[in-house]
Design a protein with these regions (language model features):
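Acetyl-CoA-dependent GNAT
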Residues: 7-77, 107, 146-147
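Conserved G/P- and acidic residue-centered "switch" motifs that form tight phosphate/ATP-binding loops
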Residues: 59, 95, 124
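A conserved beta-turn-beta hairpin within the catalytic core of GNAT-like acetyltransferases
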Residues: 70-82, 92, 139
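Conserved active-site alpha-helix within GNAT-family acetyltransferase domains
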Residues: 98, 122-141, 145
Length: 148
């Protein structure tokens, strides 16, 4: 299977939403139409640093990655946070996730981002097997305070 990775386009919205909903369900969050619509609008807005790429095979979108570029206090150039990566379950173990990350690594080198980073659950062993091909995890612990 030949996988092509490219920036998301308006025509990808329906399939992006299906895959983003799958991502939300995987992390035990119910899909939220308002959140999906808001995120999609931000992805398409060139003034907002939220972006998405899609992996396509045989004309069908089979994977997505959403990322955010931001300034960083420990770098002279922007950092890239890979917020969401999801591959259609029927298409897994075929190099799709790797192709999405490869695309981001190439962009990092081309655009001079100071780093590309992401996180996953400690017990997401399948994803960690992929991520370990790119880098080893570090010893940082994440803390999150949510607005109530």
């Amino acid at each position: 299977m030949k996988v092509v990775v490219r920036p998301a386009e308006p025509r990808d919205e329906r399939r992006w939403r299906e895959l983003f909903d799958g991502y939300c369900r995987f992390y035990e969050r119910p899909p939220d139409d308002a959140l999906s619509a808001h995120t999609w609008r931000r992805i398409l807005d060139p003034a907002v640093p939220v972006h998405a790429i899609v992996a396509e095979a045989d004309g069908a979108v089979i994977g997505i990655a959403n990322y955010l570029l931001h300034e960083h206090t420990l770098g002279l150039t922007p950092a890239c946070y890979l917020g969401d990566l999801f591959v259609d379950p029927k298409e897994r173990a075929a190099g799709v996730g790797e192709a999405l990350i490869d695309w981001l690594v190439a962009q990092m080198k081309r655009d001079g981002w100071c780093r590309l980073y992401w996180h996953t659950r400690h017990n997401n062993y399948r994803a960690r097997g992929l991520y370990d091909k790119f880098t080893k995890h570090n010893d940082f612990v994440r803390y999150t305070v949510y607005r109530k």
